[in-house]
Amino acid sequence: MNRKTIQTATNDFSISRIKHFYTFGKKNMKMVAKFFKYEDKYFNTPFIKKIIVLTQTDLKSASFIIWLYETDDKGMPCILINESGILSKAYEGKTYTEVDITDLKIRFPSQGIFTVIELLEINENEFRFFYRFRGKGEKCIGSIIEPSIGAYPSTQGDTLILGGNGWRKNEIEKSILPRYKNKFHNLSIELELSDM
């Protein structure tokens, strides 16, 4: 029997056109979330088969965890769907990282679902680089936790960032990139749904 699948389509930008990435330094909160609204067309494919995340890393590989949440009446993540995190790995370069979760048999909730990405502050995920302040010759060392998660520009916001006071919605951002200027920067994540 052939398996029927369908993919959510929130991002119509090709990988080469994605120029903005969510990147986190050490000691910062490292969780971002994307909301997927339930649509009637998902009725015949109710199971989440794959989670597809646009990642970028300068390391050979970088690990991250995926959590899935139901939403509360205020539009925030509230009920954890998967009891343990889905450990995932991004590989060097800018690429779509596909995570198959067929075995978990998770149904797409009728009130929608949050896909949460948690970056891990471990030595293997730390990327160090040198930089200089403008007008100063002094060389400094910086570091970020990888992978970075891609974002596409949109007039509608669907992304949350976890901060010291809990989840907050992303805001319209000023950007030097014309395509991203005065737009929301939404996480480039898709779900592939299946009928079994």
Where on the chain are the PLM-derived regions?
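Beta-sheet-rich sandwich/jelly-roll-like modules and their strand-loop junctions
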Residues: M1-T71, E118-M196
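Aromatic- and Gly/Pro-enriched, solvent-exposed loop/edge beta-strand patches characteristic
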Residues: S63-K139
